[in-house]
């Protein structure tokens, strides 16, 4: 077998030199004739190499460089990454139909970290030495966001890959320019809107301007309603609104209308009157009361001079304060919470409201003189 490896006539070994042949040649040596030997005998002696553990080490194989073998898979994988960027820049939904070998798991130490270049006709991405090239980084993850243009610079590519590798980026960010500027949705919500503007109450208060005050010629004071103030300087006989019963003058018509109600007793009008049910208004009714009570000296328990009220609230306040008896020490705000009794008939009730609705308004009290008109 050794003679066959040295013989040049073997075309297979001359065409495909192997490492085994070089390995065998290192252990071959030509012995020159010693001075003691005869000069006519020259022999070629080959020393055998050390025994290898591989039993088939003597078999010669063709060189791997001379065979038509495609490139390593990691180069094809880099080529596939470049094709993905190319298809992504051209806005194609699917990558190009380029044939490539199936991907193999290659240790990260065999991959060049600083000289990896992704070349493309429209975009170029360079991996710096500080960037990680471990298989955990998903550099070729599918991208669903559209891009505005295909011309990307090195900084834009690096920012794009950093966004893909860090999923903690907020989803509220949107890409609006080739430089991948981020704009939050909160800024869009607070943008001023020209249409359908609503003026707040504060703006109305700011736009509101007070009325200009005018100076009174008599007292030299300033008033916003000078006409109403001038009526206070008028004498009772010179005021514009005069009562036809007592010829008393009033500055405003409301004051005159309130004053006329006091004369309704004299004119005998029942319009708008609220009469106290326990007040003797005329002498005829007083005589009837004397017959009922049998005592002419009984007071009417009314401190009002006429017993006629022009307002309903003052009429009810008069009844609750004068004609209903509360427990000793009852305060005004506690009147609706305590029980009491009618001062005239001494009948007990739960509270003053119960006495008003079920005793006074129904004219149930036997000592009531004036009947209360029921509202229909």
Curated annotation (Swiss-Prot):
GO biological processes: filamentous growth
Protein name: Transcriptional regulator STP4
Name of encoding gene: STP4
Classification via InterPro entries: Transcr_Reg_ZincFinger, Znf_C2H2_sf, Znf_C2H2_type
SMART domains according to UniProt: ZnF_C2H2 (SM00355)
Keyword flag Zinc: yes
Keyword check for Amino-acid biosynthesis: no
Zinc finger annotations (C2H2-type) as residue ranges: 241-263
A GO cellular component entry from the record: nucleus
Keywords (A to Z) from UniProt: Metal-binding, Nucleus, Transcription, Transcription regulation, Zinc, Zinc-finger
Compositional bias segments (type: Low complexity): 32-50, 89-103
């Amino acid at each position: 077998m050794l003679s066959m490896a040295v013989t040049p006539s073997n075309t297979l070994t001359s065409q495909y030199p192997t490492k085994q042949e070089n390995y065998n040649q290192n252990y071959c040596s030509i012995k020159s004739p010693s001075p003691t030997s005869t000069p006519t005998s020259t022999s070629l002696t080959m020393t055998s190499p050390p025994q290898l553990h591989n039993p088939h080490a003597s078999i010669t194989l063709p060189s791997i460089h001379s065979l038509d073998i495609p490139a390593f898979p990691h180069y094809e994988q880099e080529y596939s990454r470049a094709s993905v960027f190319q298809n992504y820049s051209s806005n194609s939904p699917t990558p190009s139909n380029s044939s490539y070998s199936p991907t193999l798991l290659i240790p990260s130490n065999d991959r060049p970290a600083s000289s990896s270049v992704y070349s493309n006709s429209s975009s170029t991405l360079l991996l710096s030495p500080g960037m990680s090239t471990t298989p955990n980084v998903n550099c070729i993850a599918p991208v669903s966001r559209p891009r505005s243009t295909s011309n990307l610079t090195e900084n834009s590519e690096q920012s794009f890959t950093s966004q893909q590798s860090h999923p903690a980026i907020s989803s509220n960010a949107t890409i609006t320019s080739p430089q991948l500027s981020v704009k939050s949705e909160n800024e869009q919500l607070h943008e001023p809107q020209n249409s359908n503007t609503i003026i707040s109450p504060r703006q109305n208060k700011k736009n509101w301007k007070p009325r200009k005050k005018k100076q009174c010629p008599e007292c030299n004071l300033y008033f916003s309603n000078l006409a109403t103030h001038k009526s206070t300087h008028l004498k009772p006989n010179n005021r514009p609104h005069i009562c036809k019963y007592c010829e008393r003058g009033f500055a405003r018509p409301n004051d005159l209308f309130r004053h006329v109600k006091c004369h309704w007793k004299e004119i005998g009008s029942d319009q708008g009157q609220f009469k106290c049910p326990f007040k003797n208004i005329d002498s005829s009714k007083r005589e009837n009361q004397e017959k009922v009570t049998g005592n002419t000296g009984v007071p009417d328990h009314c401190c009002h001079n006429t017993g006629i009220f022009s307002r309903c609230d003052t009429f009810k306040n008069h009844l609750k304060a004068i004609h209903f008896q509360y427990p000793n020490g009852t305060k005004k705000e506690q009147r609706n919470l305590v029980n009491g009794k009618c001062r005239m008939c001494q009948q007990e009730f739960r509270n003053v409201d119960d006495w008003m609705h079920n005793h006074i308004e129904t004219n149930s009290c036997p000592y009531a003189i004036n009947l209360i008109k029921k509202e229909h």
